[in-house]
């Protein structure tokens, strides 16, 4: 097992593990109060697309995912960091609860840190696949 020495990568891994366990308090524990969180996409094809400002708004992002899709796969396949940022590549697939359609893709997550906490998040995915799964 590899020992993580980069505190930023360890925080992102903690967030992913907390998400996987349904532990919202664990997710929020690594976020700055004024976190700037957004899932960027062309249009509004998924309920979680858009901006969430501040730690109190972030749970709505996860609720939008959890109530609309069943996650079939969520695998962090790569993490890299520099002085302020972590970039993650994630493989995920999901089935839309209302349509029964499935999408599978790689996502990119960009995490920026300030004072040891996640202050900025941008996520991108194959929005064409996501929109098709919701239609």
Give residue spans per PLM region.
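Short, low-complexity N-terminal intrinsically disordered segments enriched in polar/charged residues
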Residues: 1-33, 134-135
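A beta-strand edge to alpha-helix "cap/lid" segment located at domain peripheries
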Residues: 2-6, 60-135
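Hydrophobic alpha-helical core bundles mediating ligand binding, dimerization, or RNAP-core interactions
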Residues: 12, 16-19, 31, 39, ...
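Hydrophobic pocket/interface hotspot
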Residues: 12-15, 27-28, 35, 54, ...
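Short glycine/serine/threonine-biased micro-segments
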Residues: 20, 52, 98
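A solvent-exposed, acidic/Ser-Thr-rich amphipathic alpha-helical stretch
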Residues: 26, 32-83
